Amino acid sequence: MFENLTDRLERSFKILKGEGKITELNVAATLKDVRRALLDADVNYKVAKEFTDTVKDKAIGMNVLTAIKPGQLMVKIVHDELAKLMGGEASELHLSGKPAIVLMSGLQGSGKTTFSGKLANMLKKKQHKNPLLVACDVYRPAAIDQLKVVGESIGVPVYSEPDNKNVNEIADHAIQEAKANGHDVVIIDTAGRLAVDEQMMNEISSLKEHVCPDETLFVVDSMTGQDAVNTAKEFNDRLDFDGVVLTKLDGDTRGGAALSIRTVVTKPIKFIGTGEKMEAIDVFHPERMADRILGMGDVVSLVERAQEQFDEEEAKRLQKKIQKNKFDFNDFLKQIEQIKKMGNIKDLASMIPGVGKAIKDIDIDNNAFNGIEAIIRSMTPKERTNPEVLNQSRKLRIAKGSGTSIQEVNRLVKQFDQTRKMMKMVTGSGMKQMMRNMPKMK
């Protein structure tokens, strides 16, 4: 995410390396490079100019403390201004209606249907809501089926009327259905449309006026850069939406939309999509995004994702197994599955300070786990729970069954043994023993 921009900004800050203090001359040289980096990232020209002018005003003439190098101060100023540029603080959904209504809008192919499912899933799991998805795309033949597939995957019901082309009526009936069945949030998925399509824009404007949604969200593909910003402005002029959802942000190496949209549209970015899975949705935090853009990582978001996947009871159960040296391949497989649910591995690694830069040229994705999973799934229940029984003939059978080599099976078994020993060392009495064996501080 935003790798190109991160690299360019790092190079820009190197201009100040070795400088004793901030001067108008070295600030101008640095910010000229910063502005060029922003423009190359497809940031709106006016936004880039205003941003660098603000940073320049704050930096010039500032008395730098002897402990703070000019480069470090510039990073701090740029960080704070980036966070402000993207909204300053997270903007929450306001769901006060009974039921609360969320209306989706955007171009075709922007990811509205998938995001509708992600939002329903998040509200269900994190806020214990009982959402209802509503299919109001009456034009695309497969739209209703797509939403139903999404709904089934997360256990959320979908309301649809395949033979009705009146979206206002469908929404009315869906709200009645929600009230009758205790659904406290209604998420209305609509057809994709262009802002210049008068008939389609009139339809969604009428729908908004008819249902009076608590939130109207504009969903846009972040990888379209400035086009995303321009489209958002056109939609906002007609629809006056409440917030923006940036999808496919995990594949966006530039970041122009995220950095420009708040200033141009004057509406907050509320959510970001970071992958294809239903769990790949984050509340947008400008401060954290500024951290990531400047290569500082985002440990808070990483911990939050981990907490969503690992519950306390499971952690206690696992700890007991580790202490008794009973950690087995079933547990190992479960850990892999939970890590995969957290999102793209490279994206997760980039949240750890310093790691993103180290792995930027390495091709890492969740497919790296496929071989490990295939090997474990090719084991018998006895072999999974008792790894000690894995002799050469068993390993050969597992290699054939998993489509891997005997060397790969041996490597996994060796890594598993090392992991098990290390886990026992840090969770049980082994850690106390290690501490006792360490030389005393003099």
Task: Set out the residue ranges of the language-model regions.
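Short, glycine/polar-rich helix-capping loops at beta-to-alpha or helix-loop-helix junctions
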Residues: 141-147, 228-231
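Residue-level signature of catalytic and energy-coupling elements of molecular machines
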Residues: 16, 42, 78, 107, ...
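Short, surface-exposed connector motifs at secondary-structure boundaries
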Residues: 126-132, 154-158, 184-186, 211-216, ...
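Conserved phosphate-handling catalytic cores of large alpha/beta enzymes
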Residues: 171-175, 179, 183, 195, ...
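Long amphipathic alpha-helical segments used for membrane anchoring, targeting, substrate engagement
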Residues: 2-19, 288-442
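Short, small-residue-enriched loops and turns at beta-alpha junctions
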Residues: 110, 139-141, 165-167, 192-196, ...
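Primarily NTPase-proximal linker/entry elements flanking Walker-type ATP/GTP-binding cores
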Residues: 8-136, 143-164, 170-190
